Amino acid sequence: MFSLSLNLKTNPLLDNKTHRSSSGIGFRGSTISTVKCSLNNSKDLIVKIRERVKGNVEISPSAYDTAWVAMVPDREYSSQRPRFPECLDWIVKNQNSDGSWGVQSPSMLKHSLSCTLACLLPLHKWNVASPQLLRNGVEFIRSSALAATDKNQISPIGFDIIFPMMIQYANDLNLELPLNQDLVHILFRNREAQLPRNKNLEYVAEGLGNSINWNKVLLMHQRSNGSLFNSPATTAAALIHRHDKKCLEYLNSLLSVYKTWVPTIHPVDVYARLCLVDHLQGLGVYRFFHPEIEDVLQETFRLWQQKDDEIFADTACRAMAFRLLRMQGYPVTPDALGAYVDGESFESSGTDTVLELYKASQVRLPEDDDTLEKLHDWTFKFLKQQLESKTILDQQLLRKVEFNLKNHRGILDAVKHRRNIDLYDIDHIRILKTAYRFPTVYNEDIFLLSAQDFMTNQAQFQKELQMLERWYYDDCRLDDMDFGRNVLRITHFISANMVYDPQLFEARLAFAKLISLTTRLDDFFDHHGSIQEAHLIIELIREWNEPSTITFPSQDVEILYSAVYTTTTDLAEKAYPVQGRCIKSVLIYLWICILTGYKIEMASCTAETLPDIDEYIEIGQASIGVNICVLGFIHFLGVKISEEMVMGEECDKLWKNAASITRLLNDIQTFKKEQEERKINSVIILMNSGLSEEEAVSNILKMVIDKRKELLKLVVRREGSVFPRIVRDAFRKTGNLGFYLYNFTDEFTLPLQMKEDMKLLFHDPPHVHSATSHVT
């Protein structure tokens, strides 16, 4: 099946005499004490996470925004006193020991400078702080001032515009700052250079003072909740310059919730819950939270239909909502992202926002216009340029961008879960105009549950390999054949990525066995067996007699038929308790289909004329092995599947789309080798019709993308399917598997990448990340 793509006779992972594994070799799961794992408290963690999904969103205080709110004067008292004195109290009580305010990190001194100067302004303006507190803050600014122009420091959005203006505000208030004048000149020159380039000046309007038309800003950008951009700082700045009842109501509503401080963005409920859903899915623990996730998505879709500000006024939120809703079959259309197809207007956008747009651009359906393709083109180029220019300072974000671009065609689910656990930072800091933490989304509970669940799977995967080895070496004697590829370890790896739930181990074992057998049979038909032996094996399976009653012409035919017979009988027995019927006849039929496909391919090698592309794809769909492997596998997913469902039109479309993706991607990688061996291949067929190699490959890739869109549409639809989502997902994962296997440029790259992924999945324990330098 998929092994056709591997084609790696020299690959150490495919050694014909691969040694059996010993229990626990290289398995260090027991060392996970570094992340405080206890396999007994998963239920408690699930309960706590469910409460987070349903409860109030947790977000850290923003010293920067609280300071701007503290600067708002009370107009009822002729602006001679603060309108929000409780914010001043918070500032006084929350200075850091080094004199700064805000979240601290060595890589975020610009953020600390911004927060500290912002806090000094209202303290000095209203004359409420002790001289020592002010001196400590001023001293921090003096000692850290050089960081303001350091390109290696992570910069908050709009820092180059806002920070110089706050220096000017300090000067207007007679607050002396011991800053080098050359540095101040550089800051203001940088500010002047940034002003014409920044396409989102209104968002950083607190750094523009009287130079901006505040009435126009309010008219164009004030949201229904009274805020400007859901930003307390910008809203407070508007209220300082223009008395606006809605702005005041917004700030009052904030302080009724947070009492003495404000966050840097509010409201953030929709975005926070979408992030939480995205993490639960990406970390592989979503199966514990199906009702909660569905509730979040239903509410999000309701707001989507209303074009709610909280979604549509936030680019990252809109992109994430589109992706998550579409992947669950909600009717959302790409025109909602049409405003973002012009990449030039996003020069000043954060890399994390562009990454969200990039991920949204990949969820394409057949009926879509070119919006998502255009979005994909510029976001891919933007992110690639960010990597090449080394401008992403946050190492966690850098790894996320690298991971997404490297796997832009597809990634296996379990590998994705494992790598997402590595990327999950419980102390993760996000940054807008200031840095903040998001405990609802990044917390120890989610990490521990993900790590514990992964360790449970990892231990189960180890047991399954030993079970597969007994089947392969003892029950089937497949290693007694002196030809062909032993892909047992790879099929074990592939099966682990088809279903992650440790309880569905029979499904993984079935998938691994079926792929191993199809690979052995394919090698026999392709390189070793004669036409007569190929006919004989098909007839033996059609007649289905006990191996001991048959006189075989060769040991190879005996081993192969006996392996098919024994394995099929065993799978049918194991499927019976769930299915309530014997599936043996279905499996026999599928074996005949795939072997007939092999036979047709053998005959085509000696044919005088090539088939046309449609005829070839029909043959290739059968011979790639998706039908027997996936249609056998889905009987072990814990849901009842009738024979009518398996033989029905929907299933036919599902497996044929998945098979076409795999076959055509295989062809792109192997056509040069197969051309030398005088075999048929879709690329060769198109080149024979007059296309160049480049044109032929491009045409095949377009077919693949179209098939992928068709497959995704069948998988995500919410109505009209006879299969539950877990079954339809098996075909989506099969398509992703094709992209994973054929995402490499040569036969030597593949084993190295796969070997690394196998090590992560089967041996390496997850490690906790807790570093305040991880900022997005």
From Swiss-Prot:
Provide an example Pfam family for this protein.
Terpene_synth_C
The protein's superkingdom reads Eukaryota
The record's free-text note on cofactor binding: Binds 3 Mg(2+) ions per subunit.
The organelle transit peptide extends over: 1-36
**Residues reported in the UniProt entry to bind Mg(2+) 3:** 666, 674
**What biological-process terms (Gene Ontology) are attached?**
gibberellin biosynthetic process; terpene metabolic process
Where the protein is mainly located, per its record?
Answer: plastid
What does the record give as EC number? Answer: 4.2.3.-
Tell me where in or outside the cell this protein is found.
Plastid, Chloroplast
**Residue ranges of the motif DDXXD motif:** 522-526
**Pathway assigned to this chain's UniProt record:** Secondary metabolite biosynthesis; terpenoid biosynthesis
Q: Does the keyword Phosphoprotein apply?
A: no
- Which InterPro entries does this chain map to? Isoprenoid_synthase_dom_sf (IPR008949), Terpene_synth_N (IPR001906), Terpene_synth_N_sf (IPR036965), Terpene_synthase-like (IPR050148), Terpene_synthase_metal-bd (IPR005630), Terpenoid_cyclase/PrenylTrfase (IPR008930)
Protein keywords = Chloroplast, Lyase, Magnesium, Metal-binding, Plastid, Transit peptide
Provide the tissue specificity: Barely detected in leaves and germinating seeds.
Molecular-function GO terms, alphabetical: magnesium ion binding; terpene synthase activity
UniProt-annotated binding residues for Mg(2+) 1: 522, 526
Protein role: No detectable products in the presence of CPS2 or CPS3.
Q: Any notes on this protein's domains?
A: The Asp-Asp-Xaa-Xaa-Asp/Glu (DDXXD/E) motif is important for the catalytic activity, presumably through binding to Mg(2+).
Q: Report what the protein is called.
A: Ent-kaurene synthase-like 1
This chain's source organism reads: Isodon eriocalyx
